[in-house]
UniProtKB/Swiss-Prot annotation:
Listed name of the protein: Large ribosomal subunit protein bL27
PROSITE patterns: RIBOSOMAL_L27 (PS00831)
One Pfam family of this chain: Ribosomal_L27
Entry keyword Ribonucleoprotein: yes
GO cellular component, one term: cytosolic large ribosomal subunit
Lineage: Bacteria, Bacillati, Actinomycetota, Actinomycetes, Mycobacteriales
UniProt GO molecular function: structural constituent of ribosome
GO BP of this protein: translation
Keywords assigned by UniProt, alphabetized: Ribonucleoprotein, Ribosomal protein
PANTHER family the UniProt entry points to: LARGE RIBOSOMAL SUBUNIT PROTEIN BL27M (PTHR15893:SF0), RIBOSOMAL PROTEIN L27 (PTHR15893)
Record's compositionally biased regions (Polar residues): 1-13
Region (Disordered) residue spans: 1-25
Family: Belongs to the bacterial ribosomal protein bL27 family.
Organism in which the protein naturally occurs: Corynebacterium efficiens (strain DSM 44549 / YS-314 / AJ 12310 / JCM 11189 / NBRC 100395)
């Protein structure tokens, strides 16, 4: 074990990799079932209608439709509003 550090060494210079968290699909955007809507740590956004929550609190679409953000009891909710079926 050296009693002195080598020339030009430093105990600094480390940082964790960015986790790419945040909202991935915004209000009004069309999404398919399974698409990730929000990546988060903790429940900053809560799952609403047709939205599921993963083990790491990621919110994802359960059905195809449009993304809608709302507030309910001071909680930010993410919902999926299903598209109306058009008869052809």
């Amino acid at each position: 074990m050296a009693t002195k550090k080598g020339a030009s060494s430093s105990s600094n210079g480390r940082d964790s990799e960015a986790k790419r968290l945040g909202v991935k699909r915004f209000g009004g955007q069309q999404v398919n079932a399974g698409e990730i809507l929000v990546r988060q740590r903790g429940t900053k956004f809560h799952p609403g209608e047709n939205v599921g929550r993963g083990g790491d609190d990621t919110l994802f679409a359960l059905k195809t439709g449009a993304v809608q953000f709302s507030t309910k009891r001071n909680r930010r909710m993410v919902n999926i509003v299903e598209n109306e079926a058009v008869d052809a």
